[in-house]
């Protein structure tokens, strides 16, 4: 059992804020993290999020639907502005792409970057048409590891083997995006991703980047 209190929100938060100490624990812990190592033809998710964090404005808004890379995101991305993170957690599949468009429409003066797993992206891919049709300048980054990473992780924890239909071969998100009218790029390494992100962010238009990664 716990104690519960009924109090005015604004007054309560103001009083609580005065009692909170500023700490650097998170930054110190991040500094001690050893980033993941890229492969010859694919990036570690750490690399993807590091470059997103480096190249985007300080007030960028992140919309995230990539469950299996959550640790990489939180260990790498620095969020210091209110209202800068949106995620469905376990609320349902396909949230990320359309939600990013909604957030961008609601916050036209801030850049929205949507980091979406390839498994999740397939559940809401038609949102790209809306982005193109209404020129909503979201930058969509599809982390393409070729598998339902979250389900693979669950299988590992349950010591289940030979599970079918977890792989996602043969999906070309670059061609799909261009078919909807969204400029698209493919990045296999940090240099290619840096170039693609720089161009996409400067365009002021919707863009999709297929970032080739591996399940970690």
Model feature map: region roles:
Residues 21-104:
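Active-site diphosphate/adenylate-binding microenvironment
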Residues 2-6, 13, 71-216:
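Thiamine diphosphate
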Residues 11-28, 208:
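Flexible, glycine/charged-enriched surface loops at secondary-structure junctions
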Residues 5-8, 42:
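N-terminal donor/sugar-recognition subdomains of glycan-related enzymes
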């Amino acid at each position: 059992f716990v104690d519960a209190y009924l109090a005015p929100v604004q007054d309560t938060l103001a009083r609580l804020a005065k009692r909170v100490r500023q700490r650097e624990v998170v930054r110190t812990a991040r500094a001690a993290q050893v980033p993941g190592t890229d492969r010859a033809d694919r990036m570690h998710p750490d690399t993807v999020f590091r470059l997103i964090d480096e190249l985007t404005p300080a007030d960028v808004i992140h919309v995230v639907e990539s469950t299996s890379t959550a640790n990489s995101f939180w260990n790498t991305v620095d969020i210091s502005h209110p209202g800068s993170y949106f995620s469905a957690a376990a609320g349902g599949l396909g949230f990320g792409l359309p939600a990013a468009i909604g957030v961008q429409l609601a916050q036209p003066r801030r850049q929205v970057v949507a980091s979406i797993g390839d498994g999740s992206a397939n559940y809401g891919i038609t949102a790209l048409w809306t982005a193109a049709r209404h020129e909503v300048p979201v930058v969509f980054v599809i982390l393409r590891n070729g598998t339902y990473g979250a389900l693979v992780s669950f299988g590992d924890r349950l010591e289940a083997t030979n599970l079918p239909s977890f792989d996602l071969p043969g999906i070309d998100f670059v061609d799909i995006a261009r078919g909807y009218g969204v400029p698209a790029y493919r990045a296999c390494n940090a240099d290619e991703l840096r170039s693609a992100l720089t161009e996409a962010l400067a365009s002021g238009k919707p863009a999709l980047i297929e970032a080739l990664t591996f399940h970690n």
